[in-house]
């Protein structure tokens, strides 16, 4: 790796002083993440105007408390748009509080699942108890990651460490998400939980998370639908005895790496997805233009289906950039397609001129690249110095099947 940190095992349990476990029984699951000591926390949430009760409750808790000890999350029900949903959200936290012996004011919560269905609190309370019993026996990051899965095909977890003198700082995370992914979380259905043993103020952590989320989670698109429950939390407990101000650049880069890897895992697990799309937009006149254009590429349903079918229909890329609203000159821009895995690449369009035409070597190479599972599309608008990278996935038959049967 180019960065000065190392990939390690353990996810949210890798940093000092954190434990986690979870339990899932068919539809419902519960994850508990706890710190041995008081921690500061930052959170980012969905900007959907229809938002879940745990989002409201966690925003309230973050505002009113300075220190935190635990995160609890459930899968199986979004607890959104339901009568008595806020009471259920509070009861969920209260149950965890009684078991963990941690004040309710120090517990943050999140939910994921079907919208508009009443929480089965009897089942959920049993799952909280089972998750707690599992946590008493052992700390298990894999179980914690599994318990929050819904339509996810695989667990999403990552951790890194870096040195500051003789001391070590660790950051770890878990996430869930496969469909309904197009977060726009101000400075996630997508849930992300990150832990670190850095010593940092609440305001510093908030700024670092906002910057990381803008470049990672907020650049991830599976289907263009924004969830009511998107949430990312970072807990920092200071157990490394390293202060953030000793390693600002290193920590921010490591947090961005964790966030980006989790975001890429989420889009790679898009319901029925087989391919990761990385859209790199450079040469834009403004940062806003760069993001609009790169997001337009990964949002395009026509492009997603072309990627699924390994069809190098570069016109769909050009069209997506063209309607994004970014400043461009159709007679002077580049489109390059490459394999992230093999490094093979070819121009499709260069300086506004089509190269990948019928019978050309460029088209043949593009067809070969499109068969890979990790594809990078690079567009150079030649209008300035701004750049942005967005992440998406292909869209195929399985996505329709999963979502047509979701509540049945």
Swiss-Prot record:
CDD domains: OAT. It is an enzyme of class 2 (transferase). The record marks 188-189 as: Cleavage. InterPro entries: Arg_biosynth_ArgJ, ArgJ-like_dom_sf, ArgJ_beta_C. The record marks 112-113 as: Involved in the stabilization of negative charge on the oxyanion by the formation of the oxyanion hole. It catalyses: N(2)-acetyl-L-ornithine + L-glutamate = N-acetyl-L-glutamate + L-ornithine. Catalyzes the transfer of the acetyl group from N(2)-acetylornithine to glutamate, forming N-acetylglutamate and L-ornithine. Heterotetramer of two alpha and two beta chains. This is Glutamate N-acetyltransferase.
């Amino acid at each position: 790796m180019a960065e000065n940190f190392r990939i390690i095992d353990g996810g949210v349990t890798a940093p000092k002083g954190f434990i986690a476990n979870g339990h899932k029984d068919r539809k419902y699951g519960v994850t508990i993440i706890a710190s041995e000591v008081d921690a500061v926390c930052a959170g980012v949430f969905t900007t959907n105007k229809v938002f879940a009760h745990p989002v409201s409750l966690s925003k309230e808790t973050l505002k009113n408390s300075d220190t935190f000890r635990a995160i609890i999350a459930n899968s199986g029900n979004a607890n959104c748009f339901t009568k008595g949903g806020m009471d259920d959200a509070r009861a969920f936290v209260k149950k965890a509080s009684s078991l963990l012996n941690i004040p309710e004011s120090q517990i943050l919560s999140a939910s994921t699942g079907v919208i508009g269905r009443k929480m089965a609190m009897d089942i959920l309370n049993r799952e909280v108890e089972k998750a707690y019993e599992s946590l008493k026996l052992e700390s298990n990051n894999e179980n914690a990651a599994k318990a929050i899965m819904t339509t996810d095909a695989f667990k999403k977890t990552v951790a890194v460490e870096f040195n500051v003198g003789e001391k070590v700082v660790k950051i770890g995370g878990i996430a869930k998400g496969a469909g309904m992914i197009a977060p726009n979380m101000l400075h996630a259905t997508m849930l992300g939980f990150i832990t670190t043993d850095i010593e940092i103020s609440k305001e510093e952590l908030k700024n670092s998370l906002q910057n990381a989320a803008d470049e990672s989670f907020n650049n991830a698109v599976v289907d263009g639908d924004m969830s009511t429950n998107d949430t990312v939390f970072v807990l920092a407990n200071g157990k490394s005895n390293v202060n953030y101000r000793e390693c600002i650049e290193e920590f921010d880069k490591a947090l961005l790496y964790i966030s980006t890897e989790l975001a890429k895992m989420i889009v790679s697990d898009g319901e029925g997805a087989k391919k990761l799309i990385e859209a790199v937009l450079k040469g834009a006149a403004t940062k806003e233009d760069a993001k609009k254009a790169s997001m337009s590429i990964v949002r395009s349903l026509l492009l997603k289906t072309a990627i699924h079918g390994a069809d190098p229909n570069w016109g769909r890329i050009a069209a997506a950039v063209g309607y994004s609203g970014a400043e461009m000159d159709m007679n002077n821009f580049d489109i390059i397609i490459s394999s992230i895995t093999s490094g093979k690449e070819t121009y499709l369009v260069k300086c506004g001129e089509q190269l990948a035409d019928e019978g050309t070597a460029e088209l043949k190479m593009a067809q070969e690249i499109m068969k890979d599972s990790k594809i990078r599309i690079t567009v150079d608008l030649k209008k300035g110095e701004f750049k942005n990278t967005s992440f998406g996935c292909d869209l195929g038959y399985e996505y329709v099947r999963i979502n047509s049967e979701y509540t049945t």
